[in-house]
C-alpha cells in the first residue's frame, strides 16, 4: 500500500513544481525543452521514479485497481494501530533490520525500498513516530529504534525518544561514512 500511496501523493504534490510558477527553472529553447531540463535538474532519480509510479497509479485505468485498494489497506493498518493503542501508550521497535547504510552502498532502488519496511506502517497509519540513534554496531554504523504513539500524541513520542537518546549516550559520530 505504501509503495502505491506515497508515490501517488508525491506525484500529486510535486506536480506544481513545474519551473513556471514554483521551484527551479532551467531555460530551454522552447517550452517543452524548458520542462524537460527543469524536471531533469530539479528532481533526483528516486523522486522522478516515484513521480512516474504515482502518475501511473492515479491514472483512470489504474486508480480503482491500485490506489483505492491501497487506501483500504491503509485504513486497516490505521485500525490495527488504534486497537494496539487501546492496550499501551507507546510502541518501540527497530527503525530498520540493520545498521544505517554507508553512503556508497551501491544498493538498487528495490533494495533501498526494502530499507523503509520498518517505517511504512506508521506512515500509512498517520501516527507520530520518531527514529532515535541507540548505539553503534561493530561495523561502526549507527543503529536506530523508533517510538510510535497514538495519533496526535506527538509530545509523548518525543519525550520517550529524548529519554532513550539520553540513556543510550550516543554521543559518538559514526566511524564509517563511505563504507570505509
Show the residue positions of the predicted features:
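Short, surface-exposed loop/helix-turn segments at secondary-structure junctions
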Residues: 2, 29-31, 65, 69, ...
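Short gly/ser/thr-rich secondary-structure transition/capping motifs
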Residues: 27-37, 71-79, 111-113
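Glycine-rich phosphate/pyrophosphate-binding loop
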Residues: 23-51
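Gly/Ser-rich, acidic/histidine-flanked active-site/gating loops
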Residues: 1-11, 16, 20, 136
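Structural helix-boundary/capping segments
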Residues: 48-79, 87, 124-180
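Short glycine-rich anion-binding loops that position phosphate/pyrophosphate groups of nucleotides
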Residues: 19-20, 57-59, 96-99
Amino acid at each position: 500500500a505504501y509503495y502505491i500511496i506515497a508515490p501517488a501523493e508525491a506525484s500529486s504534490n510535486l506536480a506544481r513544481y513545474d519551473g513556471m510558477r514554483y521551484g527551479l527553472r532551467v531555460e530551454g529553447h522552447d517550452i517543452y525543452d524548458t520542462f524537460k531540463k527543469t524536471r531533469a535538474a530539479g528532481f533526483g532519480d528516486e523522486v522522478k521514479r516515484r513521480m512516474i509510479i504515482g502518475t501511473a497509479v492515479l491514472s483512470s485505468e489504474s486508480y480503482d485497481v491500485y490506489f483505492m485498494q491501497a487506501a483500504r489497506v491503509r485504513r486497516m493498518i490505521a485500525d490495527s494501530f488504534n486497537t494496539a493503542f487501546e492496550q499501551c501508550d507507546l510502541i518501540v521497535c527497530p527503525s530498520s533490520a540493520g545498521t544505517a547504510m554507508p553512503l556508497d552502498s551501491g544498493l538498487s532502488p528495490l533494495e533501498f525500498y526494502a530499507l523503509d519496511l520498518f517505517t511504512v506502517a506508521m506512515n500509512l497509519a498517520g501516527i507520530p513516530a520518531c527514529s532515535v540513534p541507540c548505539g553503534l554496531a561493530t561495523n561502526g554504523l549507527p543503529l536506530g529504534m523508533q517510538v510510535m504513539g497514538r495519533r496526535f500524541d506527538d509530545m509523548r513520542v518525543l519525550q520517550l525518544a529524548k529519554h532513550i537518546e539520553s540513556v543510550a549516550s550516543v554521543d559518538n559520530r559514526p566511524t564509517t561514512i563511505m563504507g570505509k
